[in-house]
């Protein structure tokens, strides 16, 4: 994977940048030493990104916009003649992520609130690595062993944390702080145009 970034603007409270990238991903799936051609992929994509981060008081907000397009470079597989519902190696995918972090103090205690909303949209049927996934600790928590994937969808994560430094000296070499976190997450997957529902 190759990625180059150009800072468009920077000052004491904000930074704006654009990025260009190129990635190549190859997967090989086998059953009893036999390669499954229809489940093995060679995908190359170009990536265009825009990022803006800004400090607002003691908080910080960050916006990422992205466009990814499947192309035929670096030995990527051809477009072929996909049937209805088959993944397309020449896809267009758009993504957006907005995050906010706000530390604060209340009654002399340290708290922080963070929120992240992210989503992607594609009118094409995507291969599995390009699809958005819900479930697990990195998206919608509470569904560790269950996941949903789709070509288009998104999720919203929220977390409120309380932290306190360890004051007992013998414990500090192993534990610097402890705390409690409350989280609320929600997500949605849109069925692709070849599926009902």
Predicted regions span which residues?
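C-terminal beta-signal and terminal closure region of outer-membrane beta-barrel proteins
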Residues: 193-197
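Polar, glycine-rich mid-to-C-terminal structural blocks
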Residues: 12-33, 47
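C-terminal outer-membrane beta-barrel translocator/porin domains of Gram-negative envelope proteins
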Residues: 28-192
